[in-house]
Every structure is written in structure tokens, then in C-alpha cells.
UniProtKB/Swiss-Prot annotation:
Protein name: 4-hydroxy-3-methylbut-2-en-1-yl diphosphate synthase (flavodoxin)
Family, as annotated: Belongs to the IspG family.
Gene: ispG
Function per UniProt: Converts 2C-methyl-D-erythritol 2,4-cyclodiphosphate (ME-2,4cPP) into 1-hydroxy-2-methyl-2-(E)-butenyl 4-diphosphate.
Cofactor: [4Fe-4S] cluster
Pathway(s) of this molecule: Isoprenoid biosynthesis; isopentenyl diphosphate biosynthesis via DXP pathway; isopentenyl diphosphate from 1-deoxy-D-xylulose 5-phosphate: step 5/6
């Protein structure tokens, strides 16, 4: 039953205001030409799968490594992380940067992800590592016991000397075991002990914040610090980042540490990141997808872009809205046309981006029958309503909410493509 009093009270203009919430205020961190945090656009990041670096032919290996990084950059990745896991990779960095620069990108898009060997590499290859735009430190394995603080301090001092931003990246798969054990012991003695999951989340947040504070004490400025706490479960991700946002103003990198493959990976990533972004939390994101053999690594970039575009935080390509089809839709023509329009946009976008700024905000509707076709088309910049069962074999086209013309015959796509081209030329110059 409808609660009229509640409806009258709640259905105010404020209730219908658009999300997201106001952005969580964070310090701005500049990585090359990319700005993370503050009111800057959410940054899309990826990680290269990498190649084996042949110690006897580092330059040739570096070129193959750079090829993947360049593919990710062309797909829209604004930062690309590489595993800084060997002396060979450290030696390859200048050659990788050279290839990236040749392609017209800034070599500073590279983020070096160091683990156990990071302290050694920054000492042995200081001139190479400083060519990176940012380095990532994992507090859980940069060193253990008495060596932890010593190695952490050396890396931070190196970053300060060379003016390199640092991401302090905590991961629940490699969490500082001493900190975790300490919190577990304290919890076991408590009169009101919490679950182990709560203590694990607390340890993640404390590890990140304690490490960031330690970096500040050493001398790393606030505009050089990004933090992250990676987990694999969506609810843990939301809990941990909500706590980080309440506790600090460091720039935040979002993502599940291992999202998984296929639909599961994409849905988990979307669920977690969307909630946080809608609540104003997050400055840079990555979709850590397990690609099936043969799948392009650039898929993770596309997922991040789709998340940001779907919730209105950024625009990368014209949006194509299309109906799913039902018993009213006639044949596969609207599905085929949808695919053709999407493919055409992909082909044209490199040119449009250069010549037609703003085209990424364009909205196109491809609908399959008269029920929602005209109405949905009127909400788009361009819309086409194909005929369903029992309808005349014609397709109505709408421009900026008004009827424009009717198409029919076997060349609907070619004619609609021409309409798209004309619209882009007329409105985005």
C-alpha cells in the first residue's frame, strides 16, 4: 500500500538530486603530466603483463615490453604499472621509456611496482629508476623484522631526493604479519573480541596509514603520497576505503587485488568501485582482471572507462544506448545496427578526438520497436527506432529530441552513419 504521507514528505527535489556525493578532498599528486586527487578527473590505470627480459639482450626485450605498455596507453590507460622485480627490468627501464616517448606518450606514465627487491634496485640503479613517474612500495614485504624500517626509509629517501611520488600499496595477500599478529593478540585478550575479518581490515588500514605517516616523518611531502589497500572481496574493499577516507586526505588508488575472470571479475570490480566513487571516494582506479588466454590486456582499461562513463564521472566515447530486444522486436536488425554503430565509433574516435572535441559526450540510441524507440531516441543526440512486429518497415530518426527523417531499405546503416558524421561535424568543432 502506498504511504501517501511518506511520499509527500520524501519526494522533494532534494531526493531526486543526482549522485555522486561531493568528492572526498585529497591532496593532488602529480605523476608526470597526470594529476591524481583533488578535483582532478579520476585517473585510469592498468598493469602490463610484461615479458621476460633477456639479460644478454635487454634493449630488444625492452622494446617488446614497451609494445604492450603503448597498447595500454593507446587504449586510454593514463598510468601503466610494471613489475620492478629484477635487475634486468631495472636495466630495461631507459629503453622502455625511450620507446614510449617515441610513440608520443610521456615516459612518466610508468609506475614501478617494487616488492622484496625494491631497496636493492633503487640503490644499484638510481639513474634508471628515477625515470619512472611513480614507485609503489608494499609495506608488507619491503623488508622484515629489523630490516623493515631501514629499507623503507632508504626507498623513501630515494623518492625524496629524486622528487618521485610513492604509492604505499598494502595488500591483504602480503600484509605485514607482525602488525597483524599484534592486533590479533590484542583482540584475543579483549573483553569484546571482534571477528578475524574485522581485525584483518583494521590491520590493512593501519599498515597503510602508519606507513604514510612514517614517510611524512622521513620527509616525503603530502603531495607525493598515494595509498591503497587491496583486497579481493567487494564488501571488504568498501569497508577499508571508507575507513581510509574518514581517517586521512591522502590520494586514494582503488581496485580489487584479484577481481577474477570474465563476468565475475568485471561485475565485482564494477560493484566495489561504483559504490566508492558514487560516495566521492577514489582518485585513480584499476580493474585487476584475469584475462583468458588470447584476450587483450586492454580490456581492463575499457572496464574502468565504462565504469566512469556509466556513472557520469568522465566521458571517453559517444554513448550508445540500445534495447535488449523482446517479443515485439522484429529480426536481428537492431542488434546488428547496434554493433555496426559501436564498431564505427571505435574506428572514427582517433580522428574525432583530434578534430571534434566534446564528441565523447554524444549520446546515440538504437531501439528495436515503437514502444520505447521514439521516447528513448528523444533523450539522445541522435536516435533511430527500427520497426518491430506489425509496424511499417521504416526507421524513424530523431535529432536532439525532434523527428528528423525516416530511413528504409537495405542501406539503413550507411545512411545512419552519414547522419552521425554530419552531426559530429555540426556540433563538435
Amino acid at each position: 500500500m502506498l504511504n501517501k504521507d511518506l511520499v509527500d514528505h520524501d519526494l522533494s527535489d532534494e531526493v531526486c538530486e543526482l549522485l555522486p556525493a561531493s568528492r572526498h578532498k585529497t591532496y593532488v599528486v602529480k605523476v608526470g603530466q597526470v594529476k591524481i586527487g583533488g578535483n582532478n578527473p579520476i585517473v585510469v590505470q592498468s598493469m602490463a603483463l610484461g615479458v621476460h627480459i633477456d639479460s644478454d639482450n635487454v634493449k630488444s626485450s625492452a622494446k617488446r615490453y614497451a609494445k604492450e605498455i603503448i597498447e595500454l596507453a593507446h587504449a586510454g590507460s593514463e598510468l601503466v604499472r610494471i613489475a620492478l622485480n629484477s635487475e634486468e627490468v631495472a636495466r630495461a627501464v631507459p629503453y622502455i621509456v625511450e620507446e614510449i616517448n617515441k610513440e608520443g606518450f610521456d615516459g612518466k606514465i610508468l609506475v614501478g611496482c617494487g616488492q622484496y627487491e625494491l631497496d636493492k634496485l633503487v640503490r644499484n640503479y638510481p639513474d634508471n629508476i628515477k625515470m619512472l613517474g611513480k614507485i609503489r612500495i608494499n609495506p608488507g614485504n619491503i623488508g622484515f623484522g629489523d630490516k623493515h624500517d631501514e629499507k623503507f626509509e632508504r626507498v623513501i629517501e630515494y623518492a625524496i631526493t629524486h622528487d618521485i611520488p610513492v604509492r604505499i600499496g598494502v595488500n591483504w595477500g602480503s600484509l605485514d604479519k607482525y602488525l597483524l599478529q599484534k592486533l590479533m593478540d590484542e583482540n584475543s585478550l579483549s573483553n569484546n573480541p571482534k571477528s578475524s575479518d574485522v581485525i584483518l581490515r583494521k590491520a590493512l588500514v593501519m599498515s597503510a596509514l602508519n606507513s604514510a605517516q612514517k614517510a611524512e616523518e622521513i620527509g616525503l611531502s603530502l603531495d607525493k603520497i598515494v595509498i591503497s589497500c587491496k583486497v579481493s572481496r567487494v564488501q571488504d574493499l568498501i569497508s577499508v576505503y571508507t575507513a581510509l577516507a574518514k581517517s586521512s586526505n591522502y590520494a586514494l588508488h582503488l581496485g580489487l587485488t584479484e577481481a577474477g575472470t570474465g563476468n565475475k571479475g568485471m561485475i565485482s570490480t564494477t560493484a566495489g568501485l561504483t559504490y566508492l566513487l558514487q560516495n566521492g571516494i577514489g582518485d585513480t582506479i584499476r580493474a585487476s582482471l584475469t584475462q583468458r588466454p588470447g584476450e587483450p590486456r586492454v580490456n581492463e582499461v575499457a572496464v574502468c572507462q565504462e565504469i566512469l562513463q556509466s556513472i557520469g564521472l568522465r566521458h571517453f566515447n559517444p554513448q550508445v544506448n540500445s534495447c535488449p530486444g523482446c517479443g515485439r522486436t522484429n529480426s536481428d536488425r537492431f542488434r546488428i545496427l547496434t554493433e555496426e554503430v559501436n564498431d564505427y565509433i571505435k574506428i572514427r574516435m582517433p580522428t574525432w578526438k583530434k578534430k571534434n572535441p566534446g564528441v565523447e559526450h554524444m549520446n546515440i540510441a538504437v531501439m528495436g520497436c515503437i514502444v520505447n524507440g521514439p521516447g528513448e531516441s528523444k533523450h539522445a543526440n541522435l536516435g533511430i527506432s527500427l520497426p518491430g512486429y506489425g509496424e511499417k518497415p521504416i526507421s524513424a530518426v530523431y535529432k536532439d529530441g525532434k523527428y528528423f527523417k525516416t530511413l528504409q531499405g537495405d542501406n539503413i546503416f550507411e545512411e545512419f552513419k552519414a547522419i552521425i558524421d554530419d552531426y559530429v561535424k555540426e556540433h563538435y568543432t
